[in-house]
Design a protein with these regions (language model features):
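C-terminal segment of classical bacterial N-terminal signal peptides
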Residues: 14-23
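A bilobed periplasmic-binding-protein/Venus flytrap-type ligand-binding module shared by bacterial periplasmic
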Residues: 106-117, 219-231
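Periplasmic-binding protein-like
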Residues: 134-143, 241-261
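Short helix-initiation/N-cap motifs at beta->coil->alpha
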Residues: 56-67, 154-182
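Ligand-binding "clamshell"
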Residues: 87-99, 113-114, 186, 191, ...
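Short, polar/charged alpha-helical segment
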Residues: 33-58
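A conserved helix-loop-strand patch within extracytoplasmic ligand-binding domains
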Residues: 99-148, 247
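Beta->alpha turn/N-cap motifs
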Residues: 58-62, 72, 77-86, 103, ...
Length: 268
């Protein structure tokens, strides 16, 4: 009986050590491939010099990285902007905070069918992200170009139900953000997040018919639970991601498609 108990404890220890959550000196960070995982890869060697084994787990959706960080499967994530996190925390009850602000990805409007938004036909099919904040963000961008009017042009949670004027009778199709680049041939235009535009070969500066201005509030952040956000390793990662060296890397690699916005946030 005692032998069985020892075996059971040993098995439990093995399972725990092999679990998805990181051990001391290791940070497991969930990230979308571009540009987030690429930026993390850039600081990986510097993190190792600080004694941190930075492990990057790639995701292609906007839900699982937050759930995994909240339940401890990840130490944190790097894929979302602050307004998205705020809404996610409210809607899903997760306990996540912003660790640092790293960069801004201007959202753009793309098309395989027209070269200018002036050529957008009556009744055109417009693809937008189906998550609340990015859907609202896309509608505010379209409103800024005069294509539609919305009830409150400052409300990041605006939905299609808040459209007050639609002179071109645009039809909106809400899809998962990651699917929008692949759906371009079936749409007249699509509003696409940069982290999904870049892997599809779309550059906001060269290919977008309309792009957000430099004053965008949608700063991309590293998020974690409060305890992990305050950890020495996470704070060291935040310093690396917000350094001038990383800002230089972002500027040179993405040529304005991604804009550095380095700032370490206060954890309460």
């Amino acid at each position: 009986m005692k032998k069985l108990s020892v075996l059971a404890l040993s098995a439990a220890a093995v399972l725990f050590s092999a679990s998805f959550a990181a051990n001391a000196g290791t940070l497991k960070i969930g990230a979308t491939p571009m540009p987030h995982a690429e930026i993390l890869e850039h600081v990986k060697a510097a993190a190792a010099e600080k004694g941190i084994d930075l492990q990057i787990i790639e995701f292609n959706d906007y839900v699982q990285p937050n759930l995994a960080a909240d339940d401890g499967e990840l130490d944190g994530n790097f894929f979302q902007h602050r307004p998205y996190l705020d809404v996610f925390v409210k809607d899903h009850g997760v306990n996540l905070v912003s660790v640092c602000s790293v960069h801004i990805e201007p959202m753009g409007v793309y098309s395989n069918k027209i070269k200018d938004l002036k050529d957008l036909k009556d009744g055109a099919l417009v693809g937008i992200p189906n998550d609340p904040t990015n859907g609202g963000r896309s509608l505010l961008l379209l409103a800024s170009a005069g294509l539609i009017k919305v009830a409150n042009p400052n409300d990041v949670t605006t939905t299609v139900l808040d459209i007050t004027e639609n002179p071109k009778n645009l039809e909106f199709r809400e899809l998962e953000a990651a699917q929008l680049p692949r759906a371009l041939d079936d749409l007249d235009v699509a509003v696409i997040n940069t982290n999904y535009a870049l892997p599809a070969g779309l550059n906001p500066n060269d290919d977008a018919l309309l792009i957000e201005g430099s004053e965008s509030p949608y700063v991309n952040i590293v998020a974690a639970t409060p305890d992990k956000a305050k950890s020495a390793d996470m704070q060291e990662l935040a310093k690396l991601l917000t350094s001038e060296e990383t800002a230089k890397f972002i500027r040179e690699k993405y040529q304005g498609a991604v804009v550095p916005a380095g700032q370490i946030d206060e954890i309460k």
